[in-house]
Amino acid sequence: MSRLQTRFAQLKEQNRAALVTFVTAGDPGYDTSLAILKGLPAAGADVIELGMPFTDPMADGPAIQLANIRALEAKQNLVKTLQMVREFRKDNNDTPLVLMGYFNPIHKYGVPKFIADAKEAGVDGLIVVDMPPEHNGELCDPAQAAGIDFIRLTTPTTDDVRLPTVLNGSSGFVYYVSVAGVTGAGAATLEHVEEAVTRLRRHTDLPISIGFGIRTPEQAAAIARLADGVVVGSALIDHIANASNDQQAIDGVLSLCAALSEGVRNARK
């Protein structure tokens, strides 16, 4: 089994959801970002999404757009992001790590080389928001052939006709974007989320993780009662944006992660 399959299976046995944390690689700089990345599992992150900085992150809200700008100004690129994964894997061979971003940097890097290097570095999955299933042959299929999961986004506007196409070839987990719009936007109602999870379960046996708009341990706990995973990004990144120094950024992200983790772990008790 892959790291993602193993982790979600373990958590299912424990009757709890996964806390999935998102941070942008290289934000606010390489060393601080690596310290945050290495600290997340001990702070309670079950799965980590690591953003690949890009100049035009059109699906992301202001917090993550600014994180991309900070990382790019600190000279972060895909080579350094993969190096960060290698550094992380020196100390951690259990926590699933998913790279999230856009196709352009991967295309520039070269798809075959990227897949080979990502696999060697210890990447478990990819979320590439601008690669629709109609283009599975370009990245999804070769990634999965190499043993890297390809995780799809679904939204409130993905209807029952479109869903099988979107889920075709997806693996690892399904990422349900609970608000139609950009990341970090307001949270959806729990009734809406519950209906969406029920609908998705009719179409897939994959774990369902829900993100966008989750900022507090209470919100995380509410989602953890309904879904297999709770994704938090913008709320963590705000601690980096608002920190007056690097140590404050590290401490802020990891303390919120710990609080969110407690919310998720106690949600079904």
From Swiss-Prot:
Reactions that this protein is recorded to catalyse: (1S,2R)-1-C-(indol-3-yl)glycerol 3-phosphate + L-serine = D-glyceraldehyde 3-phosphate + L-tryptophan + H2O
GO CC term, one of those recorded: cytosol
Main enzyme class: lyase
InterPro entries: Aldolase_TIM, RibuloseP-bd_barrel, Trp_synthase_alpha_AS, Trp_synthase_suA
EC number(s) given by UniProt: 4.2.1.20
Keyword Lipid biosynthesis applies: no
Catalytic-site annotation from UniProt: E49 (proton acceptor), D60 (proton acceptor)
MF-aspect GO terms: tryptophan synthase activity
Pathway(s) of this molecule: Amino-acid biosynthesis; L-tryptophan biosynthesis; L-tryptophan from chorismate: step 5/5
Keywords: Amino-acid biosynthesis, Aromatic amino acid biosynthesis, Lyase, Tryptophan biosynthesis
PROSITE patterns assigned: TRP_SYNTHASE_ALPHA (PS00167)
Keyword Amino-acid biosynthesis set for record: yes
Subunit and partners: Tetramer of two alpha and two beta chains.
Family, per entry: Belongs to the TrpA family.
PANTHER family associated with the record: TRYPTOPHAN SYNTHASE ALPHA CHAIN, CHLOROPLASTIC, TRYPTOPHAN SYNTHASE, ALPHA CHAIN
Functional note: The alpha subunit is responsible for the aldol cleavage of indoleglycerol phosphate to indole and glyceraldehyde 3-phosphate.
Protein name as it appears in the record: Tryptophan synthase alpha chain
